[in-house]
Amino acid sequence: MTQQPQAKYRHDYRAPDYQITDIDLTFDLDAQKTVVTAVSQAVRHGASDAPLRLNGEDLKLVSVHINDEPWTAWKEEEGALVISNLPERFTLKIINEISPAANTALEGLYQSGDALCTQCEAEGFRHITYYLDRPDVLARFTTKIIADKIKYPFLLSNGNRVAQGELENGRHWVQWQDPFPKPCYLFALVAGDFDVLRDTFTTRSGREVALELYVDRGNLDRAPWAMTSLKNSMKWDEERFGLEYDLDIYMIVAVDFFNMGAMENKGLNIFNSKYVLARTDTATDKDYLDIERVIGHEYFHNWTGNRVTCRDWFQLSLKEGLTVFRDQEFSSDLGSRAVNRINNVRTMRGLQFAEDASPMAHPIRPDMVIEMNNFYTLTVYEKGAEVIRMIHTLLGEENFQKGMQLYFERHDGSAATCDDFVQAMEDASNVDLSHFRRWYSQSGTPIVTVKDDYNPETEQYTLTISQRTPATPDQAEKQPLHIPFAIELYDNEGKVIPLQKGGHPVNSVLNVTQAEQTFVFDNVYFQPVPALLCEFSAPVKLEYKWSDQQLTFLMRHARNDFSRWDAAQSLLATYIKLNVARHQQGQPLSLPVHVADAFRAVLLDEKIDPALAAEILTLPSVNEMAELFDIIDPIAIAEVREALTRTLATELADELLAIYNANYQSEYRVEHEDIAKRTLRNACLRFLAFGETHLADVLVSKQFHEANNMTDALAALSAAVAAQLPCRDALMQEYDDKWHQNGLVMDKWFILQATSPAANVLETVRGLLQHRSFTMSNPNRIRSLIGAFAGSNPAAFHAEDGSGYLFLVEMLTDLNSRNPQVASRLIEPLIRLKRYDAKRQEKMRAALEQLKGLENLSGDLYEKITKALA
């Protein structure tokens, strides 16, 4: 590393000394050498002697002109071009060269296959030209692209196409103009040869918008679902939020080499092809729903992110937390609200809580950052969305929408802060959110402890609710938060008891604002069964001494699907904790009959939504289970999970087989009822695979060979690998032979290989680095093989001999210089060393020290390693 990366602090924010109002870009494109000409209209806002500091990385400067005159008062510093002696208003012209082909970090302008494309968020524009690369500089962009017509027949950028023409030597040009001022992180350029799916959407005010979806040649038949999802997103945003699209054209381009999931560049979204391409034989139900969600997410950014952007990157959750909330609502309105909520909560409990307990713990609005790319996190996005959801809960839909309208009235066309958003919500609703604001500044997961008491003589039921947030590496002191805590009370017949106090009805969302509070309810005629933290009304851990009877009662009677699922989770948690302790003492699994019977009742319930039944029957992942413990024993957790699966498979064998057969569907449709039945059927298959081996082998093999869709084929393959059935190797080979030329389809196969419970899994993963479908230059391949091994196979990654850690160190050493962003994602499991026993900690620490000693250690890795070793 050349020099130690410097931390940036939120409280150091200063408005820029200069603003750029308009920028005219010309790209003379070539993969090896692209010439960029940037002509900017600049205005000074700071002191008259303030120099103009432009950000730039990996650029070859050709010339600098001010008002058409060659300028000499400039100097290049590391990561910057500093220009002095400037007039108050001026035209700045910079010419520089870049090499897209040499750009393996996939930040700025780079090569994806035969195409050229960009990724500018957060700080990628500085890899294209010298500029004020910060989100509070909003300019109108005009972009002219010149390129070889045969190689790059399509030349795309933001806004509307305003001119085009032919040049000699087989070259052509296109000019684009975006009338909306935007920060440079929203700039995009794509050049290549594509198949195009075209459609139109008529907005509610009657404007016709051209929709264009660009995919690699030969992939057109995998594009229609994405187009359907886009039209659904546009319609939903008009109906639910009153927001209409504002340009004449909306383009999406799918590329194979992409660090993120997708990017909301104004009018020209660039997507990881994983979130665009789907055909029934290549994509699962989950893929279809993920595509719908991500297309929605990027489209919704047009207002929450583009029309109103962030003042600085510390405010990232302003656009991301809000837009994730919007995409969750979109998925819930179009699909099953309960299943969507359950999946959001699985992410929070299994992954985000772990981030809160890690060395990288940060509030949803961080206070200190070294490398901004490291803060595109579950905390900023998913916990950020939970914070928006709490505001929605406290205000209600009507007031929340008034708050949104006020937010746009005040901030459209400008760069705003999280405080601006909360202020708009407060002003529109007259609800005091001053205490609530602590969610933006405090990190960590609050723990809410509930104690209850019933007095049959006074017919009163009392809840005592206390909260504490454990210290995190970034904050020793914690304050009580404003927690909306939703409850329901059930009588012994399973009916909801109306909440009353002093003859008045009480809202079912309790406002918990102090370290400890007591809530008393009158006219409760029996000892009630409480449902607590209904709908996961706040992102907290709940502590309450449940009895098994209470939980099985809620699994049967709760009127809310989420509460039924959550009760099943709590019941399992009791026996996961018990059995991990037993395993550590060398004792066998113990599971009372009534627990198996509670799951049997779900299978036999004819009224239950199959989608909910499937969720209840899906055991928590090993990562979700890990969050039940302070010190994680990955081997014990994996073995308890398998033993639990085998026990339930044996106990419920007849019911599982009956439900499996009853939910067979001959046709495949992406409809929510069909998805629900498939999910339930495949959840049953997963258990059946752990039953009697011969029967399981036949059943799984039959489903794999008869499947007319990827969902069922992959479910069979996945079950074969998880249960280590005799048929697994033959099935895996068949899949490889059929799909080895399709990277996205092979990603599923790589994930199964990497998460296999086989003892020699690491040896297999090492061998697959040489597989014909694998390459270290594609982030999707890296995530599906190396990422899945390190992040989703903890028993193997945390092998006692430290072999998993050494493997990851090798991979990160390569990726550190090749693609620091991807390396930084992969290191996460290694930095959480303090959650493991002393022997593992020692080996993890040694691995981190080895990485810390790399000569050219990237800022991305430096930040995480130094925090982990602190």
From Swiss-Prot:
Its main location: membrane. One of its GO terms (biological process) is proteolysis. The keyword Ligase does not apply. Keywords: Aminopeptidase, Cell inner membrane, Cell membrane, Hydrolase, Membrane, Metal-binding, Metalloprotease, Protease, Zinc. Its cofactor is Zn(2+). The keyword Isomerase does not apply. SUPFAM superfamilies: Leukotriene A4 hydrolase N-terminal domain, Metalloproteases ('zincins'), catalytic domain. It is a peripheral membrane protein. Binds 1 zinc ion per subunit. Disruption phenotype: A quadruple peptidase disruption (pepA, pepB, pepD and pepN) does not grow in M9 minimal medium, does grow better when supplemented with casamino acids. Its EC number is 3.4.11.2. GO terms for cellular component: plasma membrane. One of its GO terms (molecular function) is alanyl aminopeptidase activity. It is found in: Cell inner membrane. It catalyses: Release of an N-terminal amino acid, Xaa-|-Yaa- from a peptide, amide or arylamide. Xaa is preferably Ala, but may be most amino acids including Pro (slow action). When a terminal hydrophobic residue is followed by a prolyl residue, the two may be released as an intact Xaa-Pro dipeptide. Belongs to the peptidase M1 family. NCBIfam families: pepN_proteo. This is Aminopeptidase N. It comes from Escherichia coli (strain K12). The gene is pepN.
